[in-house]
Amino acid sequence: MAAAGSCSSAGKSLLQFMKLVGQLKRVPRTGWIYRQVEKPESVSDHMYRMAVMAMLTEDRKLNKDRCIRLALVHDMAECIVGDIAPADNIAKEEKHRKEKAAMEHLTQLLPDNLKTEVYDLWEEYEHQFTAEAKFVKELDQCEMILQALEYEELEKRPGRLQDFYNSTAGKFKHPEIVQLVSAIYEERNSAIAENARTSQT
């Protein structure tokens, strides 16, 4: 890195990249806004926990480091295009086009080797052509329903965010994720049943 006091063009570009990525801390997850969740999480909140989940995998057939990198990159384009949700009714092809352009702009700010690495990670996740990308996609959906559970608990309104569970039903295949999803469902179903009992008394 350049010494303090000097300012190279590479340093300026890296600063611009970091500031753009920093926007993810201020981009709320759109699905929660549409459901009137108070203080919805940011995109970076979501990606951070996904990266932790990836770090905790014990599946030796997966490249753990790659899974963590995929988790950290997969929604990076949203610092420019925002979080495009299914309810926005934007075609999948158009969403991909917007996010591709955003990633091309973002990665142009990086040195050539890093530019290729970051962009290729995003493409790998988008096209789902590796076991790691498929695993991280399941983490993405699992983290979402875990967050839905937490919002229901915080609001003391168990069962309110059912549509997030409906949208992910049957999509979990990896044994570790299936185990975590089962624990989420068990805790949620218990809360729903308890709420039904207390509301009848």
From Swiss-Prot:
Designated name of the protein: 5'-deoxynucleotidase HDDC2
Residues involved in a divalent metal cation 1 binding: 46, 74-75, 140
Similarity remark: Belongs to the HDDC2 family.
A single GO cellular-component term on record: cytoplasm
TM regions (residue ranges): none
Alphabetized GO MF terms: 5'-deoxynucleotidase activity; metal ion binding
Annotated keywords: Cobalt, Hydrolase, Magnesium, Manganese, Metal-binding
Family matches, as PANTHER family: 5'-DEOXYNUCLEOTIDASE HDDC2
Domain HD: 43-145
Entry's cofactor comment: Binds 2 divalent metal cations. Shows activity with Mn(2+), Co(2+) and Mg(2+) but shows no activity with Zn(2+).
Gene3D superfamilies per UniProt: Hypothetical protein af1432
Co-factor requirement: Mn(2+); Co(2+); Mg(2+)
Catalytic activity: a 2'-deoxyribonucleoside 5'-phosphate + H2O = a 2'-deoxyribonucleoside + phosphate
Residue sites binding a divalent metal cation 2 per the record: 78, 83-84
Subunit structure: Homodimer.
The enzyme's E.C. designation: 3.1.3.89
Function: Catalyzes the dephosphorylation of the nucleoside 5'-monophosphates deoxyadenosine monophosphate (dAMP), deoxycytidine monophosphate (dCMP), deoxyguanosine monophosphate (dGMP) and deoxythymidine monophosphate (dTMP).
